[in-house]
Amino acid sequence: MLARLGHLSLLAWPLGVRSEPSLRQWLASPGAVLLLRHAQTVSGLGDPEHFRLGDCTTQRNLSQEGRADARAWGAWLTELGLRPTAVRSSQWCRCLDTARLMFPDQTIQPWVALNSYFQGHGDRAAQLRMARMEAARLARESPGFEVWVTHQVVITDLTGQYTAMGEAIAARASGAQTFAVLGRSSGPR
């Protein structure tokens, strides 16, 4: 069952996850990460057989709705006074485009750890290890939050949560191998 509270969607909350509608509060947690699944794409699942990293013509890309949603996410975060210390993205075009549309004035850091490993791409174990190690470092050292634009499979493996396109999970490393889910948001919808 989906309940709407302002700008937040609460879906399948695990026990112990706070549900108050405060993205600002969640991201104030030192070392927090906003794990955002790329915005809405054209129809399809995965990527075409002739997929090549770095060649957007061979990938499933953002739809016009997705492009508008990414811009709206960025404007909403700005309106809330939330500016990430860094923005990292999967190297897939749909993720890079989501990040660039959200944060046109920030440097976007492509990061292999956020790449999809669906359909046999990448190295799931190595990528998850990199992401978990970086999140643990951020929890120890970072006073701010980062935005990581990635894919459903990565977010699910890191948090145990499923996200729709354009939906985000606010999380923080809880030990070396796990993420504590702070909350989830569907953005300005």
Language-model segments: what does each one mean?
Residues H121-M130:
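Short, surface-exposed amphipathic charged segments that create phosphate/polyanion-binding patches used
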Residues E20-P110, N115-H121, Q161-G187:
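Active-site-proximal alpha-helix that buttresses catalytic centers in soluble enzyme cores
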Residues M133-A136:
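Membrane-proximal amphipathic alpha-helices
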Residues G31-V33, G144-T150:
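Generic beta-sheet signal
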Residues L2-V17:
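N-terminal export signals
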